[in-house]
Structures are given as C-alpha cells and as structure tokens.
Amino acid sequence: MKLTTRSRYGTRMLLDIAMHGSEQPVSIKDIAQRQGISVKYLEKLIRVLRKAGYITSTLGAHGGYQLAHKAEDIPVGDVVYALEEMEAPVECDEENPCCPRMAVCLTRTIWGEAAKAMYRKLNTFTLADLMRDASLCPKNACNISPHATH
C-alpha cells in the first residue's frame, strides 16, 4: 500500500511539533522550514489534525501549535488513519460495498484485511517511539534537507 504525502508529511509535522513544542507553541513557518514542506500544504494538514484532536493552536505573536496529548499517547496508525482520505487500499472492501462485482469478487475481503493489518502494525509505534529513534541519529545525520520528500 502506498501512503499519500498527507500521511508522511502529517506525521513529520506532528513529530516536529512534539520535538520542538514542549515548552512553547511551534510556528507553522518554523515547521515548514525544518521539514521542507510548504506552509500552504501544512495548513491543510493542520486542519485535519486539529479536527482529529491531535494538536491545539495558540493565537498571537508567540502562537503556534502544540500536541494535544503526550507523544506516548499518540499512535502513528491513528494519525495515518486520520490523514488518509481512504481507509483501504482499494475503494471497495467488505465494509464498503461500492463495486458492482461485489457479489462475485473473490479478492474483496483481502483488501480490508490488508488495511487493518497495516494500521495495527503502525499502532505499535507512538510519536514518542519515533522521537527516541531520532535521538539515536548521529549529530547532523538527522538534519532534514529543504527538499526532503519522505
């Protein structure tokens, strides 16, 4: 299954907020600069993540974004699920009967199971786990290029 940039960039943005926003809110411009993602695209992701309850915002000169929960309480799979517009790798599965061949389709059930397995595996990791992984990087090895795509 190929995840969209919404999942990859949204997870990176949450991780950035987790790593830099523990004491004060993080500005969207700072996130954009560190992650090499446009402010405009991050604004779209912020709306989704705020609605899902993962981040809070503070207005004003020193405003920005912070996690709404502790990093260890935010499972990566739940974040990806909130960011992706499609739950399964195909439009039809056993829970979404949209295909006219549904009654005779022999592969329908595996697509839903594949998605469930992916989210279950992703949920074995939290933002805190990813932060610990980042702390293992040698100094400067984890610096993100302005042209980073993953």
UniProtKB/Swiss-Prot annotation:
Organism: Nitratidesulfovibrio vulgaris (strain ATCC 29579 / DSM 644 / CCUG 34227 / NCIMB 8303 / VKM B-1760 / Hildenborough) (Desulfovibrio vulgaris)
GO molecular function, one term: DNA binding
Residues annotated as domain HTH rrf2-type: 2-132
Protein name: Protein rrf2
Gene this protein is translated from: rrf2
A Pfam family matched in the record: Rrf2
Annotated Gene Ontology cellular component terms: cytosol
Keyword line: DNA-binding
Superkingdom of origin: Bacteria
